């Protein structure tokens, strides 16, 4: 029974899984991104541009893929992501997610009030 449940859970998760990227290749590809998000991905050039360092790789893959497909709208990011291959997106996510981040985490208790 446990084995069947595990197989079922893995089958459900597989559409959301991604192969992972090459952080070294992502570092090379990130130079264009750093122009707006900052060289360390913690110091964007404007307050309305997000800090990305340390962000979860699955979030970064989803966001870039959505910009590329047009599901998420932003004229700058749509153009930038449109030029990326699926492997480029994986590589960038692997690199950026591995950087030390300054993301603000909201405690769950504050969200549930």
Predicted regions and their residues:
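Positively charged n-region of N-terminal signal peptides that target proteins for export
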Residues: 1-4
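Cleavable N-terminal signal peptides
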Residues: 6-7, 17
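N-terminal signal peptide c-region/cleavage motif recognized by signal peptidases
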Residues: 13-14
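Flexible coil segments in periplasmic/lumen-exposed cytochrome c-class electron-transfer proteins
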Residues: 20-31, 39, 72-113
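Gly/Gly-Pro-rich "capping" loops immediately C-terminal to redox-active cysteine motifs
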Residues: 23, 41-69, 78-83
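Short, cysteine/histidine-rich loop/knuckle motifs that typically chelate Zn2+
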Residues: 35
């Amino acid at each position: 029974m446990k084995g069947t449940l595990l197989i079922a859970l893995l089958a459900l998760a597989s559409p959301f899984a991604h192969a992972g990227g090459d952080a070294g290749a992502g570092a090379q590809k990130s130079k264009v991104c750093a122009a707006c998000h900052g060289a360390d991905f913690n110091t964007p050039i404007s307050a309305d541009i997000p800090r990305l360092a340390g962000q979860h790789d699955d979030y970064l893959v989803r966001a870039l893929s959505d910009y590329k497909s047009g599901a998420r709208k932003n004229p700058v990011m749509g153009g930038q992501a449109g030029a990326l291959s699926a492997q480029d997106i994986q590589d960038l996510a692997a690199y950026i997610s591995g950087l030390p981040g300054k993301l603000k985490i909201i405690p769950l208790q504050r969200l549930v009030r």
